Structures are given as C-alpha cells and as structure tokens.
C-alpha cells in the first residue's frame, strides 16, 4: 500500500516563473512511498510485486523547524510504545503475575504482532468513537413552549390584579387606565323588516355611543367611513309603479301630516284593496316604498360639483317566495357645504302578495324603532326618489354612507 504525500509540479512552470539565471529554485517535494520497515511487515503494508525501489525516501527538514516546539518531533506511532524506563518504574501489580501472563502470551505476540508494538495498537477504536444519536422516528421532539392561557371573565379579576394589567376587548392596557364611557360599542338591534331577514339599525339609546363620534388627535374627521350618530328625518310614501311623473299629493301623503307619517310606518299592515284582488297577483306585485329614516353622512372631499350628490345603495334580501322579493335601498343625499349636514334616506321595497306567506311587521319592531318620529320637512332634494334611482348609478367604496354593516 503506497502513500503519496507530494504535490506534483512541472519543470516548465518553474522555468516560466523563474526565468532569471542563478535564482534559487524550489526543490521538488519528497514523496513518502512506503511506511518504515516495522509497519511494512504487517499485512497490507508490504511492497507491491515488481517494486525494487527504496522503501523510504526520507524527507529532510531544516533544523529550525522544531525550534519553537519541544526538542523532539511530534508524537508518532513509534512514540506510543512503552519504553523500558517506563516499564521498569511501574510496580502496581506483582511481578510474578506479570511473568505468568508474559509466558502465556508469548506465542500469540510472536505470530500477530511485531517487536515493540502493543497487541491492540491497530485495533479499531470503536469504544473511543462517539456514538451516533439514537434514532427517534416516532418519538415527539421538544419544541419551544410559550406559557399562556385563555382568560375567562371569571378569573380576570384575580389574575390581573397581581399582574397590573387589565384586559379589554382589543387587548390589554395598564391597570388604572380604562376607556371612557363615551367610547362605547354601538349596540346593534335587529330591525324586523317585512321579509324578516337580517337588517340592522342603531337603537336610539346607542346613537350617542357610536365609536368615532368623539374627536381624537390621532384621527382625521375627513378620512374613513362615517360613524356619526343618526338623526331623525321625515318619512313619505312614493308609488314607483305609478305612470305619472309629477308629484301628486293624492298618491303620496303629506310629509308634514302626522297621520300620514304614522300610516307610512305601518303600510305593510294595510290589506290589499278589492281592485287588487281582481288582478293577477302572480305577475303584478304592488310595491310601496316607505322612506323610513334619514341619517347624517360625513362631508365629502370631492369638489367636482358644488351641488349635492345623490348616492344609492341596494342590498338584496334572500327570496322567501318565488313571487315576493324584498330589498332594502338606501338613498344618500349629501352636500359639500359645512352649514347644511348631509342626509341619508332609507327606502324599503316590500311587495304585497296574498299567496306568499311572509312575516308581518310588528309595530314594536317597525321602522319607528330607529326613528325618533320627527316631522321636519324633507327638502327639495329628496322630493323625487324615482329621479334619483334612475339618474344616479350605485357607487362602490366605504364612506359613501354611514351604514357600513349593510355591505
């Protein structure tokens, strides 16, 4: 078995690198072909067949290589054998027992081991090697654990008293600091519409506690959706199925009339007339629109027109029958002026059909539950909702009206 420890180099490369005559040239590295004779006699370390060269080509080194080290060169396999001085100084066990052991092992040492080498010198050092890690194919591996638990309403008072923190709806705050009473959460009450589906409105008690109404130094009143409290507004009835384009006082009751205003709230309880019984109720549905509530809307930033902008929002309700369809339409009319607040009119389209068994609207959960019943005049902008529905396309985005939960 040959061991090469030299780096081959070409003479042509050296001539190109050192063209000056008389310059010191690097000596070619000396190679270590075979181990010393004691090791070469071991099986596997002998000379190959046909080799007649020297056994060892010595690598000469200058004298100052080991000057800073110990006087002797580094330890080699020859230095690991026990010297006679060390063996003579050892008297840990009896000499008679040592002689008996030597006599028994003389034959074995003569066959397997050369002179001066211990028997286990070339044995595999399996006991000195580090063991590989045990395979954990199906065992759980440790992971980082973060201490924490879900707090309930019963143990927050006891546990947070020692921590000095108070839990709120949106996180934790230091103890002693609690949100003011004005920053409450709006209570949403279900508004029982004619179809009985999920239309919600603000109760009169929760209008003053709508979040965002209080001025904050970190918020811009002109940015984001409006959450200002709703205000009372007039109510009127307009028949969209009518062919007349003029505002006929006979078709729509007077807005300033309290009796007509009360009838407009409960128009869904009116039984169908005798004339409607004669018509085909499966194809023609008599639709009546009640303008229920008007809310204040935030000032628009657009300066495209100095007049008012009318915005229409529609929400489709699930069909309770094939012939009865109801939807909620919010008509928002705003102004760019600061003096006159903008208004939003809610329109409910509720078909009346004798075949469709739809839930009726109770007076307690009618539109009056979110309206204070004021009878102020509506103004000329909302006088003709049919023109608003026909001329103004529906717009997208939040902030166009103050009921974002209808999206």
From Swiss-Prot:
Subunit structure: Interacts with host IRF7. Interacts with host RPS6KA1. Interacts with host RAB11FIP5; this interaction results in the lysosomal degradation of ORF45 and the inhibition of viral particle release. Interacts with host p53/TP53; this interaction down-regulates p53/TP53 signaling pathway. Interacts with the N-terminal part of host NLRP1; relieving autoinhibition of the NLRP1 inflammasome.
Biased composition (Polar residues): 1-10, 205-218
Transmembrane residue ranges: none
Keywords: Early protein, Host cytoplasm, Host Golgi apparatus, Host nucleus, Host-virus interaction, Inhibition of host innate immune response by virus, Inhibition of host IRF7 by virus, Inhibition of host RLR pathway by virus, Phosphoprotein, Viral immunoevasion, Virion, Virion tegument
Chain spans, region Disordered: 1-183, 196-318, 332-407
Record field: compositional bias (Acidic residues): 91-115
Short sequence motif Nuclear localization signal: positions: 297-300
Organism: Human herpesvirus 8 type P (isolate GK18) (HHV-8)
Name of the protein in its database record: Protein ORF45
Low complexity composition-biased segments: 342-353, 360-383
Motif (Nuclear export signal): 284-294
Residue spans of biased composition, Basic residues class: 128-139
């Amino acid at each position: 078995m040959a061991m090469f420890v030299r780096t081959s180099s070409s003479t042509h490369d050296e001539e190109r690198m050192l063209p000056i005559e008389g310059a010191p040239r690097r000596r070619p590295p000396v190679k270590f072909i075979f181990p010393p004779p004691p090791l070469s006699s071991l099986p596997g370390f002998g000379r190959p067949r046909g080799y007649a060269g020297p056994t060892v080509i010595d690598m000469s080194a200058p004298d100052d290589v080991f000057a800073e080290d110990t006087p002797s060169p580094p330890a080699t396999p020859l230095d690991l054998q026990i010297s006679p001085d060390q063996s003579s100084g050892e008297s840990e066990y009896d000499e008679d027992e040592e002689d008996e052991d030597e006599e028994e092992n003389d034959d074995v040492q003569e066959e397997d081991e050369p002179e001066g080498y211990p028997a286990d010198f070339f044995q595999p050092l399996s006991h000195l090697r580090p063991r590989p890690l045990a395979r954990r194919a199906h065992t759980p591996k440790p992971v980082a654990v973060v201490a924490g638990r879900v707090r309930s309403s019963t143990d927050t008072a006891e546990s947070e008293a020692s921590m000095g923190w108070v839990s709120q709806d949106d996180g934790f705050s230091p103890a002693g600091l609690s949100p003011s009473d004005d920053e409450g959460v709006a209570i949403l009450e279900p508004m029982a519409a004619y179809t009985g589906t999920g239309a919600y409105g603000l109760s009169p008690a929760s209008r003053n506690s709508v979040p965002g109404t209080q001025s904050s130094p970190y918020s811009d009143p002109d940015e984001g959706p409006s959450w200002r409290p709703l205000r009372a507004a007039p109510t009127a009835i307009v028949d969209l199925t009518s062919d007349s384009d003029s505002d006929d006082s006979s078709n729509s009751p007077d807005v300033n009339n309290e009796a007509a205003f009360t009838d407009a709230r409960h128009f869904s309880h009116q039984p169908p007339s005798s004339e409607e019984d004669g018509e085909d109720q499966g194809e023609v549905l008599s639709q009546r629109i009640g303008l229920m509530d008007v809310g204040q809307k935030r000032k628009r930033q657009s300066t495209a027109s100095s007049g008012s902008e009318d915005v229409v929002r529609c929400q489709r309700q699930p069909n309770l029958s094939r012939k009865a369809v109801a939807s909620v339409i919010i008509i928002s009319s705003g102004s760019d002026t600061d003096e006159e607040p903008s208004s939003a009119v809610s329109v409910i389209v509720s078909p009346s059909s004798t075949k469709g068994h739809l839930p009726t609207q109770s007076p307690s959960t009618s539109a009056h539950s979110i309206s204070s019943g004021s009878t102020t005049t509506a103004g000329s902008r909302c006088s003709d909702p049919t023109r608003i529905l026909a001329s103004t396309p529906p717009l997208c985005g939040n902030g166009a009206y103050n009921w974002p939960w209808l999206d």
